[in-house]
Design a protein with these regions (language model features):
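Phosphate-binding/switch loop-helix module in NTP-utilizing enzymes
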Residues: 97-164
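Pre-Walker A adenine-sensing motif
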Residues: 10-22
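NTP-binding/hydrolysis catalytic cores, primarily Walker-type P-loop NTPases
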Residues: 1-4, 9-12, 109-110, 122-128, ...
Length: 256
């Protein structure tokens, strides 16, 4: 029997049952989906539930402001301000452009070798989280526009840092459409999918007749057992994301 303290739960209704044990601690989990699927809600909800378990969470936003994210949480009934007061939650907005510039400067000093230190260009030193959310890798990638080499180096260093510190991380990545349906998984951002220990995909679903809904799938979780199914989800006010583990997608539909 695995030790319970080796795993984390998201606390999202119906989701954790899809795993045999849970999300392994210290692993990097990619949260992928197209616009409007609920990626940020998934991560905000997981962050809040993790804080309720007494664990520190750092939510790093590269798009929305701290006030905006707190407002989102409050709308769902998640008391972000209370968690901040208790020292369990920190939501901070970062500039992806500043990070890209810092990486370029460090690479110049290191003569373009893999000697940059992610810690010096990203993470605060006065907060020691067990869980980090990065929202989003897509925003960071856009700041490295035309500099794929530098972005790859940064991502490799980021994953190494998270692994070294044994920090469980949820990394949001937006995709224009599911990239693995009907073929080999493709990652337009190079090594991200390979480096991630897990991939959770959230979808918009369009059924025949035009009805719309949502779905979620665990695509990958290295070394762990999980249900290989795509199941229905809903996003409800005052509840957040709800997963229906016994409602597998059936019939004619398109994932977007």
């Amino acid at each position: 029997m695995p030790k319970k303290d080796k795993y984390l739960k998201t606390g999202i209704a119906g989701f954790d049952i899809l795993f045999e044990h849970g999300i392994p601690k210290g692993k990097a989990i990619l949260i992928e989906g197209s616009a409007g699927t609920g990626k940020t809600i998934f991560c905000l909800q997981t962050a809040y539930n993790t804080c309720r378990m007494g664990k520190k969470v750092l939510y790093m936003s590269f798009e929305e402001s701290e006030d905006s994210l707190i407002e989102h949480m409050e709308q769902f009934g998640w008391d972000a301000i209370e968690m901040q007061k208790r020292g369990l939650l920190r939501i901070t907005r970062f500039s992806a452009i500043d990070i890209a510039r810092s990486v370029e400067a460090l690479l110049s000093e290191a003569k373009k070798e893999l000697l940059i230190t992610t810690e010096t260009v990203l993470f605060p030193h006065d907060f020691d989280p067990e869980v980090i959310v990065i929202d989003s890798l897509t925003a960071i990638a856009s700041a490295f526009s035309g500099e794929d080499y530098r972005f790859r180096i940064y991502i490799e260093q980021l994953f190494r840092y998270l692994e070294k510190k044994k920090i469980t991380s949820y990394l949001i990545k937006e995709t224009p459409a599911p990239t693995h349906i009907g073929g080999v998984y493709k990652d337009e951002h190079g090594p991200i999918a390979f480096l991630a220990d897990g991939i959770i995909c959230i979808y918009n679903v369009v059924y025949t007749g035009g009805k719309r809904g949502g779905a979620i799938e665990i695509l990958k979780m290295r070394g762990e057992s999980f249900k290989k199914i795509t199941v229905k989800i809903e996003i409800k006010s005052k509840s957040g994301l709800i997963v229906y583990p016994n409602q597998e997608l059936k019939g004619n539909y398109v994932l977007t």
